[in-house]
Amino acid sequence: METATLIAISISGLIVSFTGYALYTAFGQPSQQLRDPFEEHGD
């Protein structure tokens, strides 16, 4: 393979991995540990 193709595939893989981790953090098991500042304010 060409160098440019390998770099493009590597960068794409990193972006997909980061997006997956962000979604897991936002909606998966760790999301229960996140605090909600709007809920804490309680107007």
Curated annotation (Swiss-Prot):
Residues spanning the membrane: 5-27
A GO CC term assigned to this protein in UniProt: chloroplast thylakoid membrane
Keywords in alphabetical order: Chloroplast, Membrane, Plastid, Thylakoid, Transmembrane, Transmembrane helix
Subcellular location: Plastid, Chloroplast thylakoid membrane
Membrane topology classification: Single-pass membrane protein
GO BP, sorted A to Z: photosynthesis
InterPro entries: PSII_PsbN
Family stated for the protein in its record: Belongs to the PsbN family.
Function as written in the Swiss-Prot or TrEMBL entry: May play a role in photosystem I and II biogenesis.
Record protein name field: Protein PsbN
Gene responsible for this protein: psbN
